[in-house]
């Protein structure tokens, strides 16, 4: 029709197909927006993440035995009452980031060409690419850091030899895959590698609501 149906083609930034659906730089910003949005949920920084640490320390106290967070306060959580929501969220966000990492390498840049980003910034394609990839690396590092803190032992317990969480750093087509857990040391190595690469890419500017250098 004359008014068009382009709005029907808008893709949710939290539900990305694995078949190479990301073809323009601005597509990758939508993926990052989805990651930031998911990180604000009640299973993560919107609520529970503060309880994981503070309720197990001296800063907070759970007064009701029926509280949904009493298991953290009493250190009596297991595979049935533990923080499962964050586990699923981590791998959901991680899947989208891995698609981003795969597809962003296929973009044919004109490095010096100036473009206008969805935030109305004037950047070269190379600057925009670097920002997007740098943010994605930093987000992946933060997610793995938090997962390792929640589901793994402290590094100093045994120099990182104990098991933490599986590291999934590429697109996995098999939905039934059951990867083995990596050690705490392996997780922290992946975290520091991602952050080191992110620092090299991010511009030294402040971006509201985004990860900054």
Where are these regions (language model features)?
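Conserved alpha-helical segments that form or flank metal/cofactor-binding pockets of metalloenzymes
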Residues: 47-48, 143-159
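Solvent-exposed, polar/charged alpha-helical surfaces in well-ordered, non-transmembrane soluble domains
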Residues: 26-29, 33, 37, 95-102, ...
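Short, flexible, mixed-charge acidic loops at enzyme active sites
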Residues: 156-171
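Short alpha-helical hairpin
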Residues: 54-78, 167
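Membrane-proximal, proline-rich intrinsically disordered regions
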Residues: 3-57
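Conserved, well-structured interaction surfaces
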Residues: 68-151, 178, 182-185, 197-210
């Amino acid at each position: 029709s004359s008014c068009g149906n382009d709005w029907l083609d808008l893709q949710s930034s939290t539900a990305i197909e694995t078949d190479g659906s990301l073809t323009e730089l601005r597509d990758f910003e939508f993926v990052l927006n989805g990651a930031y949005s998911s990180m604000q949920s009640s299973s993560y920084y919107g609520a529970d993440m503060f309880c994981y640490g503070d309720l197990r320390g001296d800063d907070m106290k759970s007064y009701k035995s029926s509280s949904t967070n009493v298991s953290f306060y009493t250190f009596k959580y297991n595979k049935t009452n533990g923080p499962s929501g964050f586990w699923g969220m981590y791998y959901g966000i991680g899947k989208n980031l891995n698609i981003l990492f795969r597809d962003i390498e296929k973009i044919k840049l004109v490095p010096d060409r100036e473009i206008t980003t969805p935030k109305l910034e004037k950047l070269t394609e190379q600057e925009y690419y670097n920002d997007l990839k740098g943010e994605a690396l930093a987000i992946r590092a933060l997610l793995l850091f938090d997962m390792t803190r929640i589901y793994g032992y402290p590094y100093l317990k045994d120099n990182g030899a104990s098991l933490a969480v599986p590291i999934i750093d590429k697109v996995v087509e098999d939905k039934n895959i059951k990867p083995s857990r990596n050690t705490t040391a392996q997780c922290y190595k992946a975290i520091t590698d991602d952050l080191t690469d992110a620092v090299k890419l991010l511009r030294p500017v402040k971006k509201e609501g985004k990860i900054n250098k």
